[in-house]
Amino acid sequence: MAFPETITMDMARRRFFLRSGSGFGMAALAGLLADKPANAASATPQPHFTPRAKRVIYLHMIGAPSHLDLFENKPELVKRDGQECPESLLKGRRFAFIGGKMTLAGSRFQFQKKGRSGQELSNLLPHLCTVADEIAIVKTVHTEEINHAPAQMFLHTGFGRGGRPSIGSWLNYGLGSETENLPAYVVLLSGPLGGAGTTLWSSGFLPSVNQGIQFRTSGDPVLFLSNPQGQTREDRTQILQSINQLNSRRLATAGDPEIATRISQYEMAFRMQASVPDLMDISRETPATLASYGAKPGAASFANNCLLARRMIERGVRVVELYDADWDHHNSLERSLPRKAADVDQPMAALVRDLKQRGLLEETLVIWGAEFGRTPLRQGIDGDGKTVNPGRDHHKDAFCFWMAGGGIKGGITLGKTDDFGFAPVENPVHVHDLNATVLHLMGLDHEKLTFKYQGREYRLTDVHGNVVRELLA
């Protein structure tokens, strides 16, 4: 129950806002035209402690690559390729699709030790090998979900169902924005999204200002950002002024923070009409830079997106998330995996190298991974027991991530799995531990970064998670 004084003060406050509504709309617009948002004076959230990283570039491979053919060399698995899997290794394990006879599947690709650190990487990743001393490979990541959409949501939100905020939204909520002319959280796609879809960058129950914004690499970078045909920037200014007046009046009566978000989004969209075309024009890069990434102006590719990610963090975008599709190799792995590895190998290595050369790697955390890994078992066996274009099924119990920059100890391998790659035997890292570590590197305590919703305090790591200190430089 509210006290009488509180009610009186609230009514007076509402009368003030009502009478000043048009003034706020004009003030917002004036600040906008001066390249200063109307809410610029509001307090920016502060980290809990000194951060090791200021920005994140997250490279998510949709569908889950076979870590056993990229990062996990298992000589015993290769030796016993084609043999029936011992029952003891299968006890208590869940698989998404594979059934019947369980046959071990060794990798058909070669591994090499690279760099001063001796990181062991597949020959499918010759470019990544050149930055082996910059990356930390975690070989014992594990999750709770065995299907794509729930596992993708679990990785990004800490929960296998929709409705909760993504890690990018939590970072935006906890740290605020560093830029006035671009969103704090941007998403880029190469290939069809599939899986959990746009829930992966949803703000969930957090204020919608923390939502990720998808940029496109062809056509309008942001849908409906350009002025409609026949409308000038002056026309847009007048429309924005009128909308701001209406929204400001409604904000005064309702006090809904989502209305304030709407006002700021209109302002941001107006500023982005000037800032986004320059950002997305990678033809401004030198020929040498374009060649290093394998980027081609006008193309829609992972290479272009990696280069755009660097351009975005240079301009103050806090979180850039890249989704690359077509990694779900239940069959035809020997043909499909080399093609996909070639798509990402050069640009992601170029990204790490480019960030380092520009002095940005120390304060930019680069993360590569997927929702789960692939089984040490062969999938695609017919009724006669012969393999037909074999692949691998989903595997939640052990898979690989790599990280670089932003407080990460480069050149290390963390964790060890059994001889076949079924499960961790040293240093297991749960997805909650991984997310707790990302927040820690950004200066946030995962146990203190909370939001109260429907009577409960929520956090990204739910009630779990420990910082993986072995990864910290």
Residue spans of the language-model regions?
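Ligand-binding pockets and gating/stacking loops
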Residues: M1-A473
